[in-house]
Amino acid sequence: MIDEALFDAEEKMEKAVAVARDDLSTIRTGRANPGMFSRITIDYYGAATPITQLASINVPEARLVVIKPYEANQLRAIETAIRNSDLGVNPTNDGALIRVAVPQLTEERRRELVKQAKHKGEEAKVSVRNIRRKAMEELHRIRKEGEAGEDEVGRAEKDLDKTTHQYVTQIDELVKHKEGELLEV
């Protein structure tokens, strides 16, 4: 019972870190990156579909992304979706593919993106702590119902705290890495 609760909590914490990693990867760093476009969707036959599924995305240069739709009729929709996104880029359509020049970030924009990265990291840490709280409640329930002894539950709580600290540290490292990428000129 205790092992199950700890395993479940660790699995959920792992997912929270993965979500944080994905969230942080969508923050633009001033370098071209195909992941920048993972959250942009277009209406494709009535379904919101990510453009990463509708086109090949290549990075031939550090500040240039080339998007080649699998279907030529999606060119205009993809261009519009990118232009309307919060990426702050201006795509150019040459009739066969879309070129996106990634502009240099201003100092002010870098600071803004660092704040955004820290905020996403904090949200992920709150998520991990909520998972810990729920697991602690489960451990207290197990103790109360007599399914495990006081010592066993105490050890499990220490293990849970250690695991929580480990995942919070991972999130801090992700944010620190992203901050370094953003502030690098």
Swiss-Prot record:
<dbReference type="Pfam" id="PF01765">
    <property type="entry name" value="RRF"/>
</dbReference>
<dbReference type="GO" id="GO:0005886">
    <property type="term" value="C:plasma membrane"/>
</dbReference>
<comment type="function">
    <text>Responsible for the release of ribosomes from messenger RNA at the termination of protein biosynthesis. May increase the efficiency of translation by recycling ribosomes from one round of translation to another.</text>
</comment>
<dbReference type="InterPro" id="IPR002661">
    <property type="entry name" value="Ribosome_recyc_fac"/>
</dbReference>
<dbReference type="InterPro" id="IPR036191">
    <property type="entry name" value="RRF_sf"/>
</dbReference>
<keyword id="KW-0648">Protein biosynthesis</keyword>
<feature type="region of interest" description="Disordered">
    <location>
        <begin position="144"/>
        <end position="164"/>
    </location>
</feature>
<protein>
    <recommendedName>
        <fullName>Ribosome-recycling factor</fullName>
    </recommendedName>
</protein>
<dbReference type="GO" id="GO:0008079">
    <property type="term" value="F:translation termination factor activity"/>
</dbReference>
<dbReference type="GO" id="GO:0005737">
    <property type="term" value="C:cytoplasm"/>
</dbReference>
<dbReference type="GO" id="GO:0006415">
    <property type="term" value="P:translational termination"/>
</dbReference>
<dbReference type="InterPro" id="IPR023584">
    <property type="entry name" value="Ribosome_recyc_fac_dom"/>
</dbReference>
<dbReference type="GO" id="GO:0043023">
    <property type="term" value="F:ribosomal large subunit binding"/>
</dbReference>
<dbReference type="GO" id="GO:0006412">
    <property type="term" value="P:translation"/>
</dbReference>
<keyword id="KW-0963">Cytoplasm</keyword>
<dbReference type="GO" id="GO:0009274">
    <property type="term" value="C:peptidoglycan-based cell wall"/>
</dbReference>
<comment type="similarity">
    <text>Belongs to the RRF family.</text>
</comment>
